[in-house]
C-alpha cells in the first residue's frame, strides 16, 4: 500500500516500494541539512536583501562594464519603490513591463515587489493588439517599456486612456562613452508624452517607502508560457514559489559561491529569465553579467571575453556553447541548459569538446517549465548521468503516472511526469478551467501535470521520453493501429551525421489517420545522396509505421520566442 504520509515527508523511506514518489532515492545525494531546511517566508525583495546583507559591497550586476554593487542596487530599488508609491501604485496593483534585463528592469521588479505590487512581464515582440490586451487584462495603471519597442508602442496610448507610459533606455546605465553614443541615437515620437524612467525616479524626492508585509502565497510575478500550438498562457507566481527556486539552488550543493560570476542572456519575460537569470543569481550573491542582445555569435563572444564562472543557457544557444569552448576551459565552473533539451549526440559532442579543452566538467541538463518558475530537477557537477535530466531538488517530489488511468508507475516505466514542488505556480491568469486541468489536488498534495513523458531510474535520475500532447494514432501496412511518437522520429533524425536540426509534424490523411512529415536543416547543402542516407537511417531504426514518407529540407528552423521549435510555422505540404 502506498502511504500518502511517506509521499509528503521530505525523507527517503527505509523500504523500497518500487515507486519513486515514496522511496525518493534522489535524497541520498543531499545532506541532512538540505533535506530538513525550512523554506524562506518573505518577499522576493526581502530574500535578496537578507542573503546579501553582509556583502553589500560585492558586485551584483555587470552591465557592459558598468559595475553595480548590492548596496547601490538596493538604494536604486528603494528610490524606485518610493516613486511608484508617489505615482499611486498600491499593494496588489499590477504594473506591466515590456523590457529586457537591463538594470532598470531589475530595480523595477524588486521595487514593485517591495511595496506588494505585481510585475506583469510581457514579450518584447508582441503586436500592438497583444500589448493592449495584456495591459487591460491585469488593469495596469502603469506600462513600462524599453525604448527599443517604440515603433510598436507608438499609437496605442489613445487606446489606453488612464495608463501612464514610462520608457526605459538600455543606454542609461551604460558606462561612458557608450551612454553618450546611445542617447544621441534616440528619437521619440509618442503622441502623448511618455515619462523617461530616470526622470520618474529623480523627480520623487522622498525615499520613504511603505514596505508591504509578507503574506503567504501572495502574487508577485506574471510570466507567459511559450506555447507552440496556441496563445501563451499567463502564469502567476508568488513570492514563495520564486524564492523556492532560489533556495533549492542554494541548499542543493550546486557549487555556486558568493562573488562568482553568472552569465545571464535570457530576458526576464521568460520564467527562466526572471527566476534563474535574475532572482536566483542575486539570491546566491553572484555577479550577474547582463547580456541583452540574444544573438548566438554575440553570446559566444561574451563567454570567451568575460569568462563567467557559471553559464546557463537555453536550447537556442547550443551553437554559442560550442563556439565558446576554445583554449583552456579550466576557468569554467558550470555549463548548463534546459528548455527543449538536446540529443544524446549533441550532449556527448559538447562534453568531448569541453574535455579536449582541459575542462573536467560535463554539460549539465535539467528540466523545468514556466509553471515551475524554472527548474525542478537537474544534473550537478557532483551528481550526474549523461542523457538524464538529473535528480529532483531536495524539496521536490516526482511521480510517473499512466496517462490514461492516472495510476502511478514504478521505476523504469514511461508515463506522464507530475511534480509536487514549492516552486509551483499559483494558477494560470484568469483561466481557472486550465488551472484545474493542470494542477491536481490528491490526498492533500498538489501535483502539476507536465504533459511530458518520462521515467525515473532506481537512483532517482529522471529521463525525458517525449511529449504526451504529441502522441498520435496511425496504421501500419497490415492494418494494425499504433501510436505514433514524433519525438522518437526527431531523435533518430538528430542522430544523423548530416542533420543539424530536425522537426516532425503529423498530418491527418483522408481516413482520419496520421502520417509523419519530417523537416530537416542540413549541415552542408542538400544532395540526393544525403537524403537517401537519412531515409535509410529512418528505415533501419524505426518501425515501418513511424517512418515519414516525406522528408523536407528547409534552410532554417522556425523558433518560438524562447528558442524552441515553432511547429505552427513549419511549411505545410
Regions found by a protein language model. Give the residues of each.
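Gly/Ser/Thr-rich phosphate-binding loop
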Residues: 165, 309-312, 322-385, 397
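Conserved AMP-binding/adenylate-forming core of the ANL superfamily
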Residues: 39-40, 57-102, 106-110, 127-132, ...
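AMP-binding/adenylate-forming catalytic core of the ANL superfamily
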Residues: 126, 133, 145-148, 421, ...
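Conserved AMP-binding/adenylation subdomain of ANL enzymes
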Residues: 243-261, 269-312, 324
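Conserved pre-ATP/AMP-binding loop-to-beta segment of ANL
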Residues: 188-224, 231, 255-261
